């Protein structure tokens, strides 16, 4: 599980969906939550917030990633790789700190990932969980 500390920068709400912008270090992450300002008092601009997401929800790419709908894209390098028969655990050094990604070992091999490989870590906005 990945957990980051941030600060809410902006909130756009329509019906029961809120699109929340969170400043984490030098980057801005985006979350889509099925909560509104009325039932989630912690969702206020300027409030500190914890951003949580599973390691299996961190997508890894090599090379440029310009034409993709994912908004949460973080440049980084692979710090360590622990490869198992089916799955591999990657520790990533990104602009907002260390992240963990768990991806299929076959993908590690296909992408030729190694320690110090430059990567882009991506997380879908609806996979971010926001807590106080």
Explain the meaning of each model-derived region.
Residues 19-25, 32, 89-95, 101-102:
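Short, acidic/hydrophobic/Gly-rich beta-strand patch recurrent on exposed beta strands
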Residues 1-3, 15, 85, 96, ...:
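Generic hydrophobic/packing signal
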Residues 2-5, 10, 35-73, 77-80, ...:
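Glycine/charge-rich catalytic "coupling/switch" loops of P-loop NTPases
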Residues 2-12, 16, 22, 26:
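Long, hydrophobic N-terminal alpha-helical segment
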Residues 11-17, 81-87:
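Short, conserved beta-turn/loop elements at beta-strand boundaries and strand-helix junctions
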Residues 15, 24-26, 53, 85, ...:
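A generic beta-sheet turn/junction motif
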Residues 30, 59, 99-100, 130:
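Short loop/beta submotifs within extracellular cysteine-rich repeat domains
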């Amino acid at each position: 599980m990945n957990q980051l500390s941030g600060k809410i920068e902006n909130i756009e709400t329509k019906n029961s969906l809120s699109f929340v912008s969170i400043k984490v270090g030098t980057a801005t992450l985006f979350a889509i939550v099925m909560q509104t300002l009325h039932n989630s008092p912690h969702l206020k601009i300027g409030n500190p917030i914890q951003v949580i997401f599973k390691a299996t929800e961190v997508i890894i790419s090599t090379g440029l990633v310009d034409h993709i709908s994912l908004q949460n894209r973080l440049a980084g390098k692979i710090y360590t790789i622990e490869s198992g028969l089916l799955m591999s655990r990657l520790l990533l050094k990104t602009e907002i700190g260390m992240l963990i990604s768990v991806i299929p070992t076959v993908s590690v091999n296909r992408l030729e990932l190694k320690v110090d490989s430059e990567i882009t870590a991506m997380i879908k906005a609806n996979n971010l969980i926001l807590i106080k």
